[in-house]
Design a protein with these regions (language model features):
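Generic structural microfeature
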Residues: 9-13, 77, 107, 122, ...
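Membrane-water interface regions at transmembrane-helix termini and the short interhelical loops
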Residues: 2, 108-116
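Membrane-helix interface "capping/anchor" motifs
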Residues: 113-121, 163
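Membrane-interface coil-to-helix junctions
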Residues: 20-111, 127-154
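Membrane-interface transmembrane helices that cradle and orient dolichyl/undecaprenyl
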Residues: 156-163
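Alpha-helical transmembrane segments of integral membrane proteins
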Residues: 7-15, 100, 120-125, 149
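Start-transfer (signal-anchor) and selected internal transmembrane alpha helices
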Residues: 1-25
């Protein structure tokens, strides 16, 4: 494979980067989206975070939500979780929510390319997928885990179809 074969894909990925930051320009000024669920998560996870800071260990139970529940559903940090590093690499370390828009674009583009769709049509399809209104609604609501799942779904489908 020579550079002329991958050149259009490199250009399109660079376009995805440009669009991700152009759409979320306030990120470049240090601003962040204040999603409702993210704000409430800060309060829900305070007891767990305080315990982590004071003991250096992870709490496995919290009393600060629903009269008590397992902490792993809220804020346990797993040091052996390598997926977070893979996510950082694939999303190029971009801040949220630009990373999510980039993943939406890249994921659907890769899916369409794996289906042997022309790269120009694949790029248009990626923009159509990424700019679905629901994706931005869940970002504003603070549903970051759901947004990540939706962003990676096309890549999972591409991997299944490719094998």
């Amino acid at each position: 494979m020579n550079f002329s074969q991958i050149k259009p894909h490199v250009i399109i990925v660079l376009l995805f980067v440009l669009v991700s930051f152009a759409y979320f320009t306030p990120l470049l000024e240090g601003k962040r989206i204040d999603g409702h669920d993210v704000k409430t998560w800060i309060g829900m996870s305070k007891e767990i975070s305080d315990y982590r800071e004071s003991t250096g260990e992870e709490a496995l139970w919290t009393n600060s939500l629903f009269s008590g529940m397992p902490a792993y559903q809220i804020s346990v940090k797993y040091s052996s979780n390598l997926v977070r590093y893979i996510d950082k690499i694939i999303s190029l370390g971009f801040p949220r929510p630009a990373n999510l828009l980039f993943l939406y674009l890249l994921g659907f583009y890769l899916l369409l390319i794996s289906l042997n769709i022309d790269y120009r049509i694949a790029a248009i399809g990626a923009f159509a997928y990424a700019f679905s209104s629901y994706f931005f609604i869940i970002i504003q609501a603070g549903h970051m885990t759901k947004a990540h799942a939706i962003a990676y779904l096309p890549m999972v489908v591409a991997a299944v179809l490719y094998t």
